[in-house]
Amino acid sequence: MKFISPKTDFAFKKIFGSIHSQNILISFLNAIVYNNQNIIQSLEIINPYNPGVTNTIKETYLDVKAVLDNGSTVIIEMQVLNVEDFEKRVIYNLAKAYGNQLDVGQGYMMLTPFVALTIADFVLFENTDKMITKFRFKEETELFNYQDELTLMFVELPKFKKELSVLETLSDKWIYFISSAPNLEVIPSSLEEVSEIESALNIANMANLSNEELEELEQQEKLIRDKKGQISLARKEGIEIGREEGIGIGREEGMRILVKRQIRRKFGEVPPEVQTQIEQLSLEKLDILGDEIFDLAIIADLENWLANNG
């Protein structure tokens, strides 16, 4: 078996936002939003995925939207690249979605709570090791909530370090699925025992995709590669500008600093031995690593790269 990565816009919508994905999405949201509690019993997926619709990266910045049985709405985004002003965009999209609930003449009592769940393939909050973080309006000193109407939640995939053999909770298994599905060759028994994850893996099985869907997936992956290339080029140009302006950092040291920063943003803090290996890389190897880091899914991939290129 070969599984597609759930991190692409196409795959995420197909797995979690299709018309038949209700049970998959219920299990996922109960695990992530409600801390492995069976809170959600039913939901309605708004504007479910249809093949052939996704043409560009993040036309709407909103992968999946669902109304829960408690009246709340969850908007879910899978974000692969840490683009400029990303954090502000998340706030803007949540506030805009909340305000757009009302039609002309409707009163504020018609407003219902909104949750923005963002799954990031990079590190957002370097000051904490928490993988799942939740933000609400709180009083500054006594920290009591002001109207639980707006919630921001983030899942930082690079902070997830667990191997398949030590997965415990439902959230562990869902995050492992999102992080590592392309590395699987069969459906592991520990994931298969969760029927919704088994269903998600069957959807992600490349053999079950139509030619139209395979073409759409290829287009998405190409767009992501192109975007990564643009970011890599901008990084290189930044180094050259810094060198020409005489910042006082040699090209190799400047490249090393940038690569280490990229690694920290993607994987969080790395073991000392990995840091030592990075310190020993030549300028040429640092340049290559800077280009290829976006394709390394987990810390083990980075360790393997260093072992082969050190």
Show where each model-derived region lies.
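Elongated, amphipathic alpha-helical interaction scaffolds
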Residues: 1-310
